Every structure is written in structure tokens, then in C-alpha cells.
Regions:
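Beta->alpha loop/short-helix hinge microenvironment recognizer with preference
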Residues: 1-297
Length: 297
């Protein structure tokens, strides 16, 4: 997950499209560049990214979730490169590269006249003031969060799937509307994720809600690397093929080292010996239905 510093929030609200585009582009370029480096993974990765703009209290909090497999294609596309156990890419390197790429892209957008400055931000339209305003961004650590999914890949997809076509808050978090106040639940990460009520005036609630309306036609789910729209048609089947070959090779090594182990190939029901009749690749497993259970005669 890549998060923009809170210092950028006012600028984001006046320049949603350009800054959200920069967030997508620079976070993706960071992952691709660091993963490609032979000192880290040395592979071409593929991933999809989902934009979220809200915090639990509905304040502006732009960040992107990136769902990345633990590996990628070798530079010559002949093998699948696996990441090390419990380690994918160095967090500190990702933070520094992301920070540098985003601030550089922001400076370029300013030089190209793409940014809008209104109200309290009007003075930032002056180059020397904008440059001074940017300096603290170089000195702080930007938030990059890496975590292996607790419940596996399916859980991650289910979690993100709840938000892909919703905005900011779902109905089940709304508690009450009494005397001109809207109360909703929020999770306090500083207090063991306890759920707490937050009462807001109607005006304040609507203001916070409207912060998260995206520009018309904005695409909030994007694919990169070997999942990019123009590349996945050829590269995704190759990934399945290489993943299948790699897993089959590992399975054969495992069988060779354990096939004589006592009781390994015994039926858990009757205790009789079992024999391997077929091995399936991951792609084949996904395409097959589970075996039917036939009733005993």
C-alpha cells in the first residue's frame, strides 16, 4: 500500500485527477523498478492497483492498494522467479523511490502549468513558494506498507472487492440520524481497532462524503506489468505455464525424497496403499470442478 502524506491533502482536493494519476503512475513505477533490480527480485512483476481516498473518519487519505504475486518473470521470460519466504521487496527502498518519483512528478506538473491553486493555496502558484512548500516532503518517511495476506489471496480479493464500486462509507456503518446529527462507526487503529461511534452534523458529514467523489470517468482500478491490458494476453498464459512447470518440478523432487516414507501414500479412510495417477498444474486445477461424491450402493 502506498499512501500520500497528509501535507498533500489540500492540493489533492483541488487537483484530484492529476494527483491521483500521479499516485497510480509513481507507485506502479516504483514497484516495477525495484522488483526489476537484480539486487532485490530481478524479475518483471504484474499487479493490479485499487485507489482508496478515505480514512475511517471519512477524511481525505489517498492511498493505493497493490495486489502483487510473490514473484515474476525472469528478464528473458524463460522462468518464474520466486521471492524469498517472508520477504518480497525492501520497504525502505520502496519508500525512498516512491517519494522521489512522486515529488519529481509533482514538480514537473507544476512546471507544465497543470496544477490549480485556489483559496488558501493561491500563494503556491509562485515558483519559489511552491519549492519551499515541497521541501518538508523530502525529509519525511512516506508510508509504504507491505504485508503478506492474513487469509490468503482469496481474502485480499474479497476485501478489496467490497470497495471497488463503493464510495467512502457503506450503509452498515451508519448508526443513527437524530437531531441533525449523523452517527457512524469507525475503527480506531490506535486502540486495537475498536469500533467507536462518531457523531457529525449533517453538513460536516456531507462535506466529508463529497471529498471522495472522483472526477467523471476516472478509472480507480488499474493493471500494470505483465497484467497490463496490452501485455497480459501473451504474458499471463506464459506465467501460468512457468508456474505450472515450477510447481511440478518441486512436486517431483518432493516425491523422490519422500516416496519411501512409511504411511505417506496410505488412504486416510481404509489405510490401503495409494498410487499417483495424474498431476495437475495450477491452471488445470482452477478449470476443473471438484469431484462428485457418489452414494454407496
Amino acid at each position: 500500500m502506498f499512501t500520500l502524506p497528509s501535507r498533500l491533502a489540500p492540493l489533492v482536493l483541488q487537483n484530484k485527477k492529476i494527483l491521483y494519476d500521479l499516485l497510480f503512475r509513481t507507485s506502479a513505477d516504483t514497484l516495477l523498478e525495484v522488483a526489476r533490480n537484480p539486487r532485490h527480485l530481478g524479475a518483471e512483476i504484474g499487479f493490479f492497483t485499487v485507489l482508496h481516498t478515505w480514512s475511517q473518519k471519512l477524511k481525505i487519505h489517498p492511498h493505493v492498494h497493490c495486489v502483487v504475486p510473490a514473484g515474476g518473470l525472469s528478464p528473458d521470460h524463460t522462468r518464474w522467479v520466486r521471492s524469498r519466504d517472508n520477504y518480497f521487496l525492501p520497504k525502505k527502498v520502496l519508500q525512498e523511490v516512491f517519494r522521489g518519483k512522486f515529488v519529481d512528478a509533482l514538480k514537473q506538473a507544476f512546471q507544465n502549468g497543470q496544477l490549480i491553486f485556489q483559496g488558501d493555496l493561491k500563494l503556491l502558484a509562485q515558483p519559489n513558494i511552491f519549492a519551499t512548500w515541497l521541501r518538508p516532503l523530502y525529509r519525511q518517511d512516506w508510508v509504504v506498507y507491505l504485508k503478506r495476506p492474513f487469509g490468503g489471496p482469496a481474502y485480499v480479493l474479497q476485501y478489496l472487492g467490497r470497495y471497488t464500486h463503493r464510495v467512502a462509507i457503506s450503509n452498515h456503518r451508519l448508526v443513527s440520524f437524530v437531531d441533525g446529527q449523523v452517527t457512524f462507526r469507525w475503527r480506531d487503529s490506535a486502540d486495537h481497532n475498536k469500533q467507536k461511534p462518531l457523531p457529525l452534523s449533517v453538513d460536516e458529514f456531507l462535506c466529508r462524503f463529497l471529498l471522495h467523489i472522483l472526477p467523471q470517468g476516472f478509472v480507480r482500478i488499474r493493471n500494470f506489468g505483465f497484467l497490463a491490458n496490452r501485455r497480459r494476453k501473451t504474458l499471463l498464459p506464459l506465467c501460468f505455464q512457468l508456474l505450472g512447470s515450477a510447481q511440478e518440478s518441486q512436486a517431483k523432487q518432493h516425491l523422490a525424497s519422500t516416496e519411501d516414507a512409511p504411511g505417506l501414500w496410505r488412504c486416510p479412510k481404509c489405510g490401503g496403499p495409494m498410487k499417483v495417477v495424474e498431476r495437475l498444474t495450477p491452471a488445470e486445477i482452477q478449470l476443473r470442478s471438484p469431484p462428485r461424491v457418489t452414494a454407496a450402493a
